[in-house]
Structures are given as C-alpha cells and as structure tokens.
Amino acid sequence: MPAPQRKHRRGGFSHRCFPTPQTAMTPQPAGPPDGGWGWVVAAAAFAINGLSYGLLRSLGLAFPDLAEHFDRSAQDTAWISALALAVQQAASPVGSALSTRWGARPVVMVGGVLASLGFVFSAFASDLLHLYLGLGLLAGFGWALVFAPALGTLSRYFSRRRVLAVGLALTGNGASSLLLAPALQLLLDTFGWRGALLLLGAITLHLTPCGALLLPLVLPGDPPAPPRSPLAALGLSLFTRRAFSIFALGTALVGGGYFVPYVHLAPHALDRGLGGYGAALVVAVAAMGDAGARLVCGWLADQGWVPLPRLLAVFGALTGLGLWVVGLVPVVGGEESWGGPLLAAAVAYGLSAGSYAPLVFGVLPGLVGVGGVVQATGLVMMLMSLGGLLGPPLSGFLRDETGDFTASFLLSGSLILSGSFIYIGLPRALPSCGPASPPATPPPETGELLPAPQAVLLSPGGPGSTLDTTC
C-alpha cells in the first residue's frame, strides 16, 4: 500500500524568525499569566535596562581619558553621551514599530548586536568623530531597539502585579550603575580606554540573550496580523485618544524637569558648600531612594487602593515639590560638612521621583490597551527625550545668568508640577467616567486583563483589549 500522504496545514509557522504562540503545543492563557515566565521576562527587562541606561550613565568615567588622548575639551567629549541618549530616546518609536511588526524578541536581539558593534567600532577610533558615530549613533540606536520592546512585552505578562514588575525592571538602571561604575574604572586603569571599550562591547552583547528570553504571548483581542503600514506600526493614531493625548502632554512637561537633577544635582551640592565626597553622597542617597521607591510604589500601586492616574498625579507633584526644596536649601557648610538639610531634601526627592517612574509605564495599558503598550512606550520615551534635551541646557543657562542653581531647580520643579496638574484630567478622559454604557462584547470574551470596571477597545489591541477605567 502506498504511504498515506500527510496534509500540511497552512500557516504552521509564522513569517517571523520564530514560531508564533499559536503554533505552540501548549494551550495559551486566556489573559496575562501574572507570573510564571513573566518573572523571567522581568529579569530580562531588568538586565536590559541595566545594560542600556546603567551603562550609559557610567560612560562619563571614560571621558577624561578620551579628552586627554584626543586633546579635546570636556564639553566635546560630553557630546558622546548626550548624542547616545538623544538617539536612544528619540528613536524609541522605531524600536516599538519594528517590535509591533516583527515581534520583540528578534528586534531586541538585533539591538544588542548593534550596541555591541558600536563599542567595538569606537575602540579603534582615531578621532572623536568616530566616537560620535560609534557610541552616539550606532550604540544609541541599538539601545533604542531594546528598551521599549522589553518593557512592552513585560506589561503583557502581568495584570495585577504589572506596576511591581515594571518597577523591578526599572531598578536595573541604579543597580547596574553601582556595579558598572567601579568595574569600568578598573577596566580603564588596567587596559586603557580602548581595551575598556572592547570589553564593554562584550558585556553589551549580553543584551542579545536577554532578548531571546522575551517569548511572545498572544492575548485576547490581539489583531490577527501585524500592521503593514509604517505609520500604523508607529502608533501615531494613539494621539487621537483623548486620555493618551492628555497623558502625553503632561509627560512631555515632566520630562523638561525630570532629568535636570541627573546632570546638575552634584554641581548644585558643590555650589552649596559641600566638598566632593559630600556631593557624591547627596547623589548616592537620591539614587538609592529612587531605586527603593520604584519597588515599593510598584507594590502599592498593584494593591488597587488608589487608582493609578491619581497616584501618577500625586507622586509627580511630590517630585516637583521635592525639586523646589532641593533648590531652596541654603548654604549647608564647608567641604567637611555632609550637608544634612540638602541630604534630607535629596532623599525626599529620590523617593518621590522613584515612585513616579514605574507609574508612567504602568498606567499605559489602562490608557491604550495591552495591544498598544509597546507603541505607547516608544512614543512616551520620545516625548520625554524632547523635554530632557531642553531641560538641562536651560538649567545650565540659568546657572550662568544667576550664579547658582536655585532658579534652575525652581523651574524644573514648576515644569513637573505643571505636568502633574495635567494628569488630574486623566480620570475624566476615561470612558467609564462618562455615562454608563453596556460593553461591546460579553465579558467572558474580553478576558479579565485588568481589574473591573473595563471597557473594550477596538484598536490598536483589537476587540477584547481592556482598559482600566477606574477613576
């Protein structure tokens, strides 16, 4: 007898580089698993955040060696990190669009390779321009491909513990800074700046296996096929939603003041009379308060005691007020002083700023639906980058005009307070705050992705995406 012919089903494998979850042998969950492999994704996002933002913050240790080798000013070498940060933030929507089209896993893996090549290319630089191209453009674009897709994938794995998971991932920045800063100094002392950049390229390549851990997850309401139009993949249609537009405007204003302490907190402490070690302590306690608050606020937000939009407005306002206090602290002593008042103000600022950070990304699924989280994350990072590029230079200009950083921190705090005031309008922009209306589809078909009450979104997540409309 002739052997029976096998019938091959069409669509057994995706056009992507990896099988889609529909083809997996195990059944898919009806909603986010809220744990399980999601914690592996959280650990991967933690490492991705550390190997991008944490490494970027530590690069400044190599700038004195670069300035001496190329006989350039400190301002010229500072443009390396400024360019890398600008490219990383501004190109984040590109990473989101590619992730929406091809999946987060291959995009993050490619981003890790590009970032690593940027360091390797820079290790052979014969001019500072080569460092601008290698670290600023190539590595910066590689980092742009990793952060938003990783954070968006993480948000899809969690519902009740989403903000806690996001807060855990965001602590990778501070944790890696504590480890990479002394490690980079050791590499510079041992191998010089060229050898250090080569080894940093090898370390950065670990972004690729981290990306391999971002397994795709199909949720109810996901569109049957990814968008083919570049504009649709960028998610610009999200700005047609009133709630997201309000959130975007507030976040852009907050970005104008949020990054100023990253650049000018230590110089401000020196202006207030502290020595180098005292200024370093001020920065350190602010960073530790920031990291701890991200976890605590993530847990608090997931308890559901206070709606996320209200928490976002409250902690945003506290961050702005904290910067006011930091700016108004008087002269605290000489170089031997530890600066008690400024130290206390820095702790208060760090706690409030750290509490704000996970809420920015944790509130997105409630505004755009789980299906639009990756696109929304890229757009939010781009908006914050616009404010981040304007805030520190304006702060430095005010310092030059007034002689200290008081006006700079007052303006930064005012920008954050303005953005937080705009956040107050978020609950009224959500559908459930208007007249009650029946859901478009029966509740069993939507999946319990977020705590009730919920509303069905038709795009970008498709029918069945959920919206946290708690006011």
Swiss-Prot record:
Segments traversing the membrane: 36-56, 78-98, 106-126, 131-151, 163-183, 198-218, 243-263, 273-293, 312-332, 333-353, 367-389, 407-427
Catalytic activity, as annotated: pyruvate(out) + H(+)(out) = pyruvate(in) + H(+)(in)
Gene Ontology cellular component terms for the protein in this record: endoplasmic reticulum membrane; plasma membrane
Basic residues bias (residue ranges): 1-13
Protein topology in the membrane: Multi-pass membrane protein
Region described as Disordered: 1-31
Subcellular location, record wording: Endoplasmic reticulum membrane; Cell membrane
GO MF, any single term: symporter activity
Keywords: Cell membrane, Diabetes mellitus, Endoplasmic reticulum, Lipid metabolism, Membrane, Symport, Transmembrane, Transmembrane helix, Transport
Tissue: Expressed in liver, salivary gland and thyroid.
GO biological process, one term: lipid metabolic process
Reported effect, residue 340 to S: Risk factor for T2D
Record's subunit section: Interacts with isoform 2 of BSG.
Protein name according to UniProt: Monocarboxylate transporter 11
Organism field: Homo sapiens
